[in-house]
């Protein structure tokens, strides 16, 4: 299961492929540590893009529809009836396609500023025959072309990477319906470093040092990293104008937050 089944919760190839990309980008990391200027997501070796998608996919398959969406207040019923959803920072579109398959009455829009990933998302949707209720576009998290009147806006393991997470959340709030919901999936993390010095936390800190933090620094961002913690994510949501924020559910690897206008 760990080596042969891409949908298995213990599938490891995605993690190994991501790690392989780190060795291929060694010279870039040396420069990043020398200058502190950062390194954008799209400047990494392409193994990172595919490896990250393969790493997250089993977790999303096992939890997104079965537990994460049901943990949100009133969202599942809206999706069953027919809702409008924006998946911000969708990458290869794994999360977008899973939701589109599970809720055929709803319309899903996947957005990411990394064009090669969006092309992969489009191709995957075609392969799976999911084209009627899903669309993908290469735009940034605050691009006006994203539109508005969304019932649900999602950020899957990406808000902490952004150069302007408050700006992204402000734009999300403006794009939601008054009774809409923002679902923020973040890596499992406590608020203090010493509370995160476990197996999962150490893995996230290591990857974050090479991927998440440099990406944010490249845009002069706050460099939250993959172990930002609940307090920091709540502060960002409140600074963006959301009035309600709660931890909806969690797994050993992720925390699912719900924010409402």
Regions found by a protein language model. Give the residues of each.
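A short SAM/SAH-binding and catalytic strip from SAM-dependent methyltransferases
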Residues: 151-165
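Core SAM-dependent methyltransferase catalytic element
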Residues: 241-261
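Conserved Class I S-adenosyl-L-methionine-dependent methyltransferase catalytic core
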Residues: 1-83
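Class I SAM-dependent methyltransferase "Motif I" SAM/SAH-binding loop
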Residues: 89-93
């Amino acid at each position: 299961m760990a080596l042969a089944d891409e949908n298995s919760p213990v599938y490891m190839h995605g993690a190994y492929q991501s790690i392989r990309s780190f060795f291929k980008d060694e010279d870039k990391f040396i420069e990043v540590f020398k200058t502190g200027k950062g390194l954008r997501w799209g400047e990494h070796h392409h193994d990172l893009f595919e490896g990250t998608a393969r790493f997250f996919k089993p977790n999303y398959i096992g939890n997104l529809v079965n537990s994460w969406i049901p943990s949100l207040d009133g969202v599942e019923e809206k999706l069953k009836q027919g809702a409008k959803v924006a998946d911000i920072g969708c990458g290869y579109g794994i999360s977008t396609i899973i939701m589109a398959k599970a809720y055929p009455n709803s319309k899903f829009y996947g957005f990411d500023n990394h064009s090669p990933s969006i092309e992969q998302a489009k191709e995957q949707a075609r392969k799976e025959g999911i084209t009627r209720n899903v669309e993908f576009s290469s735009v940034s998290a605050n691009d006006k072309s994203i539109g508005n009147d969304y019932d649900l806006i999602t950020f899957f393991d990406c808000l902490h990477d952004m150069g302007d997470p408050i700006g992204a959340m402000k734009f999300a709030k403006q794009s939601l319906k008054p009774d809409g919901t923002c679902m923020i999936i973040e890596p499992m993390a406590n608020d203090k470093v010493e509370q995160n010095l476990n197996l999962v936390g150490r893995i996230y800190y290591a990857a974050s040092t090479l991927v998440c933090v440099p990406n944010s620094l490249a845009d002069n961002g706050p460099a939250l990293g993959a172990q930002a913690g609940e307090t920091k994510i709540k502060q960002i949501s409140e600074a963006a104008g959301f009035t309600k924020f709660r931890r909806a559910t969690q797994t050993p690897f992720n925390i699912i937050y719900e924010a409402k206008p």
